[in-house]
Design a protein with these regions (language model features):
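Catalytic P-loop NTPase motifs of RecA-like helicase/translocase cores
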Residues: 111
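A short glycine-rich, Lys/Arg-flanked "PGG" loop and its adjoining helix->strand segment in the class I
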Residues: 118-130
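Feature marks short, surface-exposed loop/turn motifs that line or immediately flank catalytic pockets
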Residues: 128, 139-141
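Conserved N-terminal segment of class I S-adenosyl-L-methionine
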Residues: 1-101, 105, 114-118, 133-138, ...
Length: 208
């Protein structure tokens, strides 16, 4: 998958931000407390809507995405925030440095090389800091409901250009993050009641 081909037309937030924003913000606020500065790396920032929300809350945000159209829109809409074209195929920490938190919302389901993705996230963090990674939730009861309602072809469609190529569970995403060196991996399920959640948010800490 060539993620640079992702096309964006608007800086507005996607529908997923409606249910991801508040729990993600609360996780970050709890992690930072009163410490300053509050530097966040938004990996897979798209057209910048989530980075802009973070900046409005006082975070110093650097957004990176492989989509040139997304970054061009983000720079135009939110000129006070730093945005760059980049991907986990390169040494992001070597290029941009270390951060107090890394966010990556609804990205990991799109990547071909998830272990490389997790390693890049790990490298971007200062010791003792957290990554916040969201992805569509897939669990037993939700998958059963999808099958019983005959929605599998819609939910797992193969016809979406540049669509989801990985379907994560808490077990597999937790394993990915643990293999990368993260500790204290926890999950939140958001968007609906937990068994039918739209997405899950992994909070993982880099050891001190």
């Amino acid at each position: 998958m060539d993620a640079s081909r992702y096309s964006y037309t608007s800086p507005e937030a996607s529908h997923t931000h409606a249910y991801l924003w508040e729990p993600t913000l609360q996780v970050l606020l709890s992690s930072f407390g009163n410490s300053q500065p509050r530097r966040v790396f938004d990996l897979g920032c798209g057209s910048g809507a989530f980075a802009n929300k973070l900046a409005a809350q006082g975070f110093e945000v650097h957004g990176v995405d492989p989509s040139l159209s997304g970054i061009e829109i983000a720079r135009k809409a939110y000129p006070e925030i730093s945005f760059d074209v980049g991907s986990t195929e390169e040494d992001l920490a070597g290029r941009f440095g270390k951060f107090q938190a890394v966010t990556s919302l609804e990205v990991v389901e799109h990547v071909y090389a998830p272990r490389q993705f997790a390693a890049r996230v790990f490298d971007l963090l200062e010791p003792g800091r957290i990554a916040v990674i969201s992805t569509p939730y897939h669990g037993y009861w939700k998958n059963l409901a999808i099958a019983l309602l005959n929605k599998s072809d819609w939910h797992h469609t193969a016809l979406w250009d540049n669509g989801h190529i990985k379907f994560w569970s808490t077990k597999t995403l937790g394993q990915l993050l643990a293999e990368a060196g993260f500790q204290d991996v926890k999950f939140l399920r958001v968007g609906r009641i937990p068994p039918l959640a739209k997405s899950m948010i992994a909070i993982a800490r880099k050891p001190k």
